[in-house]
Amino acid sequence: MGDSHVDTGATSTEAVAEEVSLFSMTDMILLSVLVGFLTYFFLFRKKKEEIPEFTKISTTTSSVKESSFVEKMKKTGRNIIVFYGSQTGTAEEFANRLSKDAHRYGMRGMAADPEEYDLADLSSLPEIDNSLAVFCMATYGEGDPTDNAQDFYDWLQETDLDLSGVKYAVFGLGNKTYEHFNSMGKYVDQRLEQLGAQRIFELGLGDDDGNLEEDFITWREQFWPAVCEFFGVEATGEESSIRQYELVLHADTDPAKVYTGEMGRLKSYENQKPPFDAKNPFLAAVTTNRKLNQGTERHLMHLELDISDSKIRYESGDHVAVYPANDSNLVNQLGKILGADLDVVMSLKNLDEESNKKHPFPCPTTYRTALTYYLDITNPPRTNVLYELAQYASEPSEQEQLHKMASSSGEGKELYLTWVVEARRHILAILQDYPSLRPPIDHLCELLPRLQARYYSIASSSKVHPNSVHICAVVVEYETKSGRINKGVATSWLQAKDPAGENGRRALVPMFVRKSQFRLPFKSTTPVIMVGPGTGVAPFIGFIQERAWLQQQGKEVGETLLYYGCRRSDEDYLYREELAQFHKDGTLTQLNVAFSREQAQKVYVQHLLKRDQEHLWKLIHEDGAHIYVCGDARNMARDVQNTFCNIAAELGGMEHTQAVDYVKKLMTKGRYSLDVWS
């Protein structure tokens, strides 16, 4: 955010003042010029419009890169490399599918994590005949690259390397409900062209708010013919099932050498060592788990995780990620329907000995552990999984249906959309509905995607709660079109976490903190306008706690306004007592609550913003207020943004297009921040 630059400049100036006696007058003049230049550079340099600036996230991943992916490709006879920027595993999955496709065209592909290589090696790629670099790049949050693509993004911004002769294609993964739709994919595509690389197929833009799988299939089925035409090659055959991993059973393995749910280092949960991140989560004890709402229709909960002695540091506005576990009942049903012994110790070993990815998940382990902690068994499987599974259906009609849903035909796409996606059929439901489909459990484990961490906005301030992280979440449970009851993996698992523990064991949650740009202004006197209905209030609890703490430290604090929304005051008014107390003691200048179902005509937060438009416009236009919006991206965030545009147009005397630009400039300057999801 913009204020981080102001902070840096202010600190530098103070340091100069303290050291002034140590310099000559000439030194002082030169230093002043330098400070002035740096201040101008950081405060007024033009931001790139394609993708917003953001803070580099530090991780514990080794900074040592592989010597050369080009040399590795030469050594293994590959000519296509598919890089992926993936936060939830989907882009990595698409990259693996593309690299696997290559064999049909007499080519050999490899999927690669850009974090593991020096991308400057791209300039040497033309040394390989018919070489091609493909980039499956997801956009995370508000236009950010994924964590593993951060270094790649930084390199693209800084390099002037000549990439003439490099052939490339890009498929982006994004969500149209977000302001910066597919920013990373668009930026990579544009920047590679600027550096001289040759695009051989049009940029693909997948929309997760629509049907990301269909978007990818549509792009992919046009991509490969274009590759064949460009390089003058022909397809060698139909798509076929090729195992990537072989099953290895371990009869007498030492239990101490078997993974039991760890994400990275073996026994890391027994011997915890900081720093903690996605590959080394901290086991935090649940100290509080209480229901926030009064109604019985939904369960909204507040959890507190103990991070004492972890050395984990967080700031208000950051996200906490938790690794959940699948419902043991679902796991047992899968084992039963497949006739498998879930407690067999096994490994899935990559048949490609040169691959960096030796196993699809930590091995050796048991099927039970894999299905509980490592594999996603509750989301609808993608079409490539159905294609691979079809061979195991002994009933011809079931095999035909599976092949049809995995095809690129219009009828097949429609069937997949209605029968799998919209009906929310997970793998167990598909096995139940297709009685002849009984794949080997090891192949199923190879095909299923990894179970991903779930991210929540932290509902506390580290100034007030340095040793705990608070979570606010709604338990997900719904009936599908097929009449089944589906439950949210993480929220159902968290709901069952009893602070009292079980059988003398504490309730533990594997977690880590991901830094965010959703930050309070550097100056405490800056007014803040917070808009967060439902669980979108979570980060604002931390913001308000921090503003209260600043007041207690004797700091002057600017106006603090909250626009919160829920259904009814006696049903789902979250943190009601806490918010009332903050309002009473003056921390909250205004507490504005929209109850959508307490009157005939529904009232939402945007209606209250419109009601208060004169005061809000003064705070924004004259007093430099910062706006924060948290919650639903599809409807609420869009409606709130439109409301602020309308306020700017009406009270600022602007045309609609000018008002839209005005709000977008607030975003560019870090004065309009979003923490939204769809």
UniProtKB/Swiss-Prot annotation:
Q: What is its EC number?
A: 1.6.2.4
Reactions it catalyzes: 2 oxidized [cytochrome P450] + NADPH = 2 reduced [cytochrome P450] + NADP(+) + H(+)
Extract the PROSITE patterns matched here: FAD_FR, FLAVODOXIN_LIKE
InterPro entries attached to this UniProt entry: CysJ-like_FAD-binding, FAD-bd_FR_type, Flavdoxin-like, Flavodoxin/NO_synth, Flavoprot_Pyr_Nucl_cyt_Rdtase, Flavoprotein-like_sf, FNR_nucleotide-bd, NADPH_Cyt_P450_Rdtase_alpha
What's a Pfam family this protein contains?
A: FAD_binding_1
The cofactors it requires, by name, are: FAD; FMN
Cellular component, GO, one term: endoplasmic reticulum membrane
Report the co-factor binding details: Binds 1 FAD per monomer.
Query: What is this protein's name?
Result: NADPH--cytochrome P450 reductase
Q: Which organism is it from?
A: Cavia porcellus
Give the encoding gene's name: Por
